Amino acid sequence: MAGQKIRIRLKAYDHEVVDSSARKIVETVTRTGAQVAGPVPLPTEINRFCVIRSPHKYKDSREHFEMRTHKRLIDIIDPTPKTVDSLMRLDLPAGVDIEIKL
């Protein structure tokens, strides 16, 4: 797999879960002998919602909610077959969304 690059994007609502998952991936990749660039923190996506508290009237009384999506980017340069195999077997938490591009 010479000259290839694997790009991994992690997304989660909890920043601690994303950081621990990124740490696990980096440790696994360095143990198998490939080079790692990252984890690079990407901008946090914030979705804000404004909701009227009352179901009927009192429009002046509103409540604000927000959802934060934390993202990290990891590049694996020149992965070995052992690296790919160990990444496939890696057990990560359920709250993390993982995108892998070759």
From Swiss-Prot:
<dbReference type="InterPro" id="IPR018268">
    <property type="entry name" value="Ribosomal_uS10_CS"/>
</dbReference>
<dbReference type="GO" id="GO:1990904">
    <property type="term" value="C:ribonucleoprotein complex"/>
</dbReference>
<keyword id="KW-0687">Ribonucleoprotein</keyword>
<protein>
    <recommendedName>
        <fullName>Small ribosomal subunit protein uS10</fullName>
    </recommendedName>
</protein>
<comment type="function">
    <text>Involved in the binding of tRNA to the ribosomes.</text>
</comment>
<dbReference type="GO" id="GO:0003735">
    <property type="term" value="F:structural constituent of ribosome"/>
</dbReference>
<dbReference type="InterPro" id="IPR027486">
    <property type="entry name" value="Ribosomal_uS10_dom"/>
</dbReference>
<keyword id="KW-0689">Ribosomal protein</keyword>
<comment type="similarity">
    <text>Belongs to the universal ribosomal protein uS10 family.</text>
</comment>
<dbReference type="InterPro" id="IPR036838">
    <property type="entry name" value="Ribosomal_uS10_dom_sf"/>
</dbReference>
<dbReference type="GO" id="GO:0000049">
    <property type="term" value="F:tRNA binding"/>
</dbReference>
<dbReference type="InterPro" id="IPR001848">
    <property type="entry name" value="Ribosomal_uS10"/>
</dbReference>
<dbReference type="GO" id="GO:0005840">
    <property type="term" value="C:ribosome"/>
</dbReference>
<dbReference type="GO" id="GO:0006412">
    <property type="term" value="P:translation"/>
</dbReference>
<dbReference type="Pfam" id="PF00338">
    <property type="entry name" value="Ribosomal_S10"/>
</dbReference>
<comment type="subunit">
    <text>Part of the 30S ribosomal subunit.</text>
</comment>
